[in-house]
């Protein structure tokens, strides 16, 4: 090895002990020690378990996170993941090797090794999903994004945040002192994690003014909420510049988690906040159980979400608004979003053509469970009949109508969000529709493209469970998606101009506007990337006599009446504000 390379490694803090290569950087608190790993023959620095907040235990439970300010002089070992935040674990489940603990607010960093002195990197912060009731940064294996990190020279960061009752409990028992943070502790954890990135990422070679947030499912909702919160307009609170949201959107959220809060308090037999604070976390997770969407961010009782997200989005993207908006907003969804919900909560109708399926009332009840915020009454008269067994008598599997409805929830809400984002003069808005099915041991073939499948293509790796294999054609599609993601992260543009990507290999991805054009990601044949852009209205085929956009209009009308909010007039927005 030449002398100058040895000096470069020493400057980067890279050294070997018994075949394990370590690397060291200095953050605000002191030096930290990570490991040097290799992905596709290229080195990447990996740091796991860096504290960014005080443990939210005892009197810090159900309060805004407190920055971790302790200093140290000897290198802190950051080579292993820390425990997951408290969440329900089903009986008989294999225990987490790293455990579960309330002391869970840590972040993880994957950083390329500089190839020349002074090389710096844009940053992508991953926010995990899990319906706000479960999950952690490494569940999907965010280290899988290491291919994106080394091939596109991007730093990947992923932090934990409180979920379930610990992240979104909003009972009045907590008292008025919690009004600033009540019901959004998990979102404030995300925000403190972003502040840590802003303040420390330069130590890893990152650009503190070049940060993109990317989330899926509850993470996709989270990145939208982070983009529309009024906290962005306070001094020192511009924490990111670009947003990528997969299978998540800004919509209506509960004013409080009344039923979940009351049920939890009753099960815990607590009538005072002192009782709630004194309980072991295991008592709380056991009382919550596996409830789907039982706890969510709340609105109107905290400073993070003083109003409904969809209203905050409409105000923020008004062309006359001077408030913060991201440089670019990318938002998309998969072809079979409802697969996950059907598989987990209605397995009797999942893969059995002989079950009775979903008559109208059962469909309304099921859709209420799936959406979290809408009651069965909301769905019964206008919406459930469009997807019930009586209406869809020609389907092979009774669950197909349910999956179609959840698909529409995702598609219609994505469309509504994009109509707002495209009117902002300062934001480049782009949307995608993902329609390529990886191999999976979990879902049968008729469910095709499941919730989260697009993330595996961006990572260009499977996790071995939900996704077991990507073909060469599918990996080529992943490479194409990487070109777009890289361009958005680097330049807030989906017209790639950097040297590492070849423009001739990818089709143009227009901004969302009057024609409502989206990118259709599908693997077709060898060496093919996405198809050319398509109109939003042509994405999903017609079900019976109802065209897709007609169903969106019905959903929007019923929604406006139910919540007493203005109905969206897409034509007005698209004609007046198109780009």
From Swiss-Prot:
Entry-listed glycosylation sites: 77, 144, 257, 269, 283, 373, 394, 469
Catalysed reactions, as listed in the record: an acylcholine + H2O = a carboxylate + choline + H(+)
Pfam families: COesterase
Keyword tags: Glycoprotein, Hydrolase, Serine esterase, Signal
Top-level taxon of the source organism: Viruses
Signal sequence bounds: 1-19
Record has Glycoprotein as a keyword: yes
Active site, per annotation: 217, 337, 451
GO terms of molecular function: cholinesterase activity
Keyword Cell division in annotation: no
Function of the molecule: May be involved in the disruption of the host membrane.
Family classification: Belongs to the type-B carboxylesterase/lipase family.
Protein name per the record: Probable cholinesterase
Organism: Acanthamoeba polyphaga mimivirus
Lineage, uppermost ranks: Viruses, Varidnaviria, Bamfordvirae, Nucleocytoviricota, Megaviricetes
